[in-house]
Regions:
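Residues within membrane-spanning alpha-helices of integral membrane proteins
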Residues: 8, 51, 108-111, 115, ...
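Interfacial helix-loop-helix linkers and transmembrane-helix boundary segments
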Residues: 65-79, 95-105, 126-129, 193-199, ...
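Hydrophobic alpha-helical transmembrane segments in multi-pass integral membrane proteins
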Residues: 90-91, 144-149, 183-186, 237-255
Length: 297
């Protein structure tokens, strides 16, 4: 693969933007970076790079989560973490076998409905959380090892369970550090780390040092849910475009169909964002209380 200066700048800026979102939400690095990156670079090349970056980043995020929040969520995380191992093993093996275009289709098709669910503010708590965690863990391990994406399903699960903000970040960090470490080991055994991996890693890792603290600072100034909704809105647009390109190149769909699909995704995306902002403005609207005025006789 020929690595150009333009590609390095592109990956550095992409990493900065994605780590900014990750710092604010506690997840989202891969969800934002991978759909954009695989438009210009194959999964087999970029996946190992992002796995290394996320192994480092998730370690930092776990440290920032705080011991009290980690302790409060540890038992709830275990049923998800343990099944990640077989999922990662299968996914890492499939990465060497599946054609890049099919991987792109799998990434975008799996990601888009999850993004829309988050953008819609979907909530329906699961009573048997531990039992639900087992298939979720296996699915996350499979998805992450093939695509390095797992933030949306993890975030959807924990937010659906009504976790408080700090406990939510701690739970997400624990799952993500487990999957990234296990995937690193699996990739190393399969020989997926190359000289190109480490060259691109140095370019993508440095912007994270700025992006994470910046995201944490910004989210402390605005509502975390508002930040999350705008991030998901952008993500839906990117994923919709990526899926339209897969329709063109993999399924030989017409340009009219492919770009009409992208337009539909954007329309749904904007409608969900508008609904959220409208509902939020109503809740923030000051209530006028009429105070009776005593009349002089």
């Amino acid at each position: 693969m020929i690595i150009t200066l333009a590609l390095l700048i592109f990956l550095a800026l992409l990493s900065l933007a994605a780590s900014f979102v990750n710092g604010g939400l506690g997840y989202g690095y891969s969800s934002l970076s991978v759909p954009v990156a695989i438009l210009v670079i194959a999964n087999r090349i970029i996946n190992p790079v992002y796995v290394l970056v996320e192994a480092c980043m998730n370690t930092v995020m776990l440290g920032l989560a705080g011991k009290a929040n980690i302790k409060a969520t540890f038992r709830r995380v275990i049923p998800i973490v343990l099944p990640i191992v077989p999922g990662v093993i299968v996914g890492s093996y499939l990465l060497n076998l599946v054609a890049p275009l099919w991987v792109k289709f799998f990434v975008y098709a799996a990601l888009l409905p999850l993004i829309f669910l988050q953008a819609a503010g979907f909530r329906k708590p699961i009573k048997k959380e531990s039992a639900a965690g087992v298939p979720l863990g296996m699915g996350i391990g499979l998805l992450y090892s093939i695509t390095t994406i797992s933030g949306p399903p993890i975030a959807l699960f924990w937010s659906n369970q009504g976790m408080a903000k700090n406990e939510f970040k701690a739970a997400v960090a624990q799952v993500r550090i487990a999957e990234s470490y296990i995937t690193c080991i699996s990739y190393a055994i399969l020989g997926l780390f190359t000289a190109t991996t480490f060259q691109l890693f140095t370019i993508t890792a440095v912007p994270v040092l700025l992006g994470i603290p910046l995201g944490m600072f910004i989210v402390s100034k605005i509502a975390a849910e508002t930040f999350r909704r705008f991030a998901m809105a952008f993500n839906a647009g990117v994923v919709g475009f990526g899926l339209s390109q897969v329709f063109l190149n993999l399924f030989n769909m017409t340009a009219v169909f492919s770009y009409s699909f992208w337009a539909l995704v954007i329309a749904i995306d904007l409608a969900l964002l508008y609904r959220y902002m409208k509902d939020r403005s109503k809740t923030l609207e000051p209530k006028i209380v009429e105070v009776p005025v005593a009349r002089s006789s």
